[in-house]
């Protein structure tokens, strides 16, 4: 394995571990500042604040990494996360928590820059494999993080945030001393180096246009992923009378199998079937899993369904790979920033929409929300079938655009 790729994957793992450490204990920290009655409201606002900052700033940071290099932006992002966790660990008033989340949201480009780094140093035909490995490392970090956070939380409610700050500080040092710059500065034109904010937003729109169909599919798939993320606990309790232990075990099994499929199967299937067919296989597997969730009535039936849902994990790496090869090397940061922005946009919209739909339909049948997910997959397959984008290159200058589109 290329050392640069390995370091990028380690950074992704550490970043996800930091997130996983703090999320289960954040409500407990909030309770110390706002009281039990206002925890849910403040928790939701903190999550939404971070996500909205990512929606706005991730494409700009990605574009910035195309201009000045991957390492400086990655270091800024890791420093922002470290500062966020340190502020949370030492906060004495609630507004400091909001300040920390604001800083982390504005500077948070770790995933986008790590993906750009991988795209810089891997051949096009193996992108799906490495994007799958990236997803697997993120999933592994999200599995390990809550375990560490749970044990650290036994020390104090602030201890998990100190651990998260230390882990992100470690990732910062790895990036500073070991990770090499992968972006070729010779490919950056003077026009790009001196680009204004208006020109940056214009260039983002120009890049999005030829990829609009694939980006819509990406958005739909990420949006569908918000259904179980939002409703798994409620659905398990109501349909199968699960307690907290069963919910936790099911999430752990799904997380592990999902990571294995992304890391081991995504690249293999894409290599033998091609990215488009790999995407279709993933959509069909996940769609069947959603349909079965809607109709099954026994708790034991969930476990084979989880394998289908895990197989759906090959979809996003294959889609990310097929989008990545349609964008020139000089615009990988911008592209990955746009994908990060779309991902966080679904994290804002999805819970609101699907929680409302579930609440509105649960009295008649609490399986409707999974059927809606299947319907969205049908839309994604139709777009995938009829949308055929050509190869695009980020518009460094107009003559280059005309030659390459």
Curated annotation (Swiss-Prot):
The chain crosses the membrane at residues 6-27, 42-62, 74-94, 102-122, 131-151, 159-179, 215-235, 245-265, 278-298, 299-319, 337-357, 364-385. The keyword Transport applies. It is a multi-pass membrane protein. InterPro entries: MFS (IPR011701), MFS_dom (IPR020846), MFS_trans_sf (IPR036259), Sugar_transporter_CS (IPR005829), Tet-R_TetA/multi-R_MdtG-like (IPR001958). Keywords: Antibiotic resistance, Antiport, Cell inner membrane, Cell membrane, Hydrogen ion transport, Ion transport, Membrane, Plasmid, Transmembrane, Transmembrane helix, Transport. GO terms for molecular function: antiporter activity. One of its GO terms (biological process) is response to antibiotic. SUPFAM superfamilies: MFS general substrate transporter. It comes from the Bacteria. The keyword Transport applies. It is found in: Cell inner membrane. GO terms for cellular component: plasma membrane. Resistance to tetracycline by an active tetracycline efflux. This is an energy-dependent process that decreases the accumulation of the antibiotic in whole cells. This protein functions as a metal-tetracycline/H(+) antiporter. Belongs to the major facilitator superfamily. TCR/Tet family. NCBIfam families: tet_MFS_A_B_C_D (NF012174), tet_MFS_E (NF012187). This is Tetracycline resistance protein, class E. It comes from Escherichia coli. The lineage of its organism: Bacteria, Pseudomonadati, Pseudomonadota, Gammaproteobacteria, Enterobacterales.
